């Protein structure tokens, strides 16, 4: 509504494309998150909080790993994919789509945290604060539009509130005694930063390498996924976690 008020209906086409990408990527990861949520619920109900701390870190890695397998190629080849999909790509669609993928990153990372809060049953205060944080997106975007008159700030505001919500979720789960924040930072976040430091130059290189065919894009995508798996094995996951993840995925596909 705010985008429409400031920039007209034409900007809504780019926003609609970004929303479709958001839905597709998040639903892909969420289909796996639904499979592991009972483990978190059961572990909390049994008051095995030390195990729960490990599960939160493990399932966070699992979720982010799946997200990156989809999001990194999509982020890298957004322009080419949109051109094939739409032919006539709306203004800002490329930028909106990439910024949306960043929003999804923090939401995927947050999922094991809010699932744990739900398992506790103490969600009233949590829901009020989270709702307040997320709704801040609207006034922040409005003020940015008034100052700079650039539609991109709608997504900058989304990213900002997604980060705030993630920080609050970490704090909330820590208060429940279900998360060692120091171990969460060192065991997950710092490893994730290391992974991104390696992956970002690959994305940057492909930004300046023009893709001329679908087959070339597919070949590059498989190369990126292969490199991502290798890098994740050494930087994000330990050997036991790597084995557990692929056993977990194989069980899910057998059920499907």
Regions from the PLM with identified roles:
Residues 101-132, 148, 177:
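Membrane-interface junctions at transmembrane-helix termini in multi-pass inner-membrane proteins
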Residues 124, 131-167, 174-175, 179, ...:
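Membrane-interface helix-loop junctions in multi-pass transport and translocation proteins
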Residues 18, 22-60, 114-119:
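Helix-loop junctions and terminal segments of transmembrane helices
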Residues 2-23, 91-95:
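Interfacial/gating helices of multi-pass transporter permease domains
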Residues 12, 125-127, 153-155, 184-187:
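Alpha-helical transmembrane segments and their helix-entry boundary regions
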Residues 55, 60-75, 88, 130-134, ...:
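Short alpha-helical transmembrane segments in multi-pass integral membrane proteins
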Residues 29, 53-108, 135-146, 201:
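Alpha-helical transmembrane segments of multi-pass membrane transport and lipid-handling proteins
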Residues 174-181, 202-256:
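Membrane-proximal transmembrane or re-entrant/amphipathic helices at the cytosolic face
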């Amino acid at each position: 509504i705010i985008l429409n008020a400031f920039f007209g209906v034409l900007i809504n086409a780019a926003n609609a494309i970004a929303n479709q990408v958001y839905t597709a990527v998040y639903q892909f990861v969420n289909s796996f998150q639904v499979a592991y949520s009972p483990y978190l619920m059961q572990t909390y109900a049994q008051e095995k909080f030390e195990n729960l701390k490990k599960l939160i870190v493990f399932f966070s890695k699992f979720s982010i790993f799946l997200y990156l397998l989809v999001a990194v190629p999509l982020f890298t080849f957004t322009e080419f994919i949109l051109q094939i999909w739409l032919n006539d790509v709306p203004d800002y669609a490329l930028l909106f789509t990439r910024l949306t993928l960043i929003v999804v990153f923090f939401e995927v990372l947050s999922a094991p945290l809010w699932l744990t809060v739900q398992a506790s049953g103490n969600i009233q205060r949590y829901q009020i604060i989270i709702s307040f944080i997320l709704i801040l997106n609207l006034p922040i975007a409005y003020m940015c539009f008034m100052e700079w008159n650039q539609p991109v700030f709608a997504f900058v505001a989304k990213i900002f509130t997604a980060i705030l919500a993630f920080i609050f979720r970490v704090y909330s789960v820590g208060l429940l005694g279900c998360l060692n924040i120091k171990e969460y930072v060192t065991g997950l976040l710092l490893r994730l930063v290391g992974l991104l430091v390696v992956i970002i130059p690959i994305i940057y290189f492909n930004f300046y390498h023009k893709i001329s065919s679908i087959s070339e894009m597919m070949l590059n995508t498989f190369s990126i996924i292969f490199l991502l798996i290798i890098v994740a094995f050494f930087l994000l996951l330990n050997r036991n976690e790597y084995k557990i993840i692929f056993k977990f995925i194989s069980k899910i596909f057998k059920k499907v």
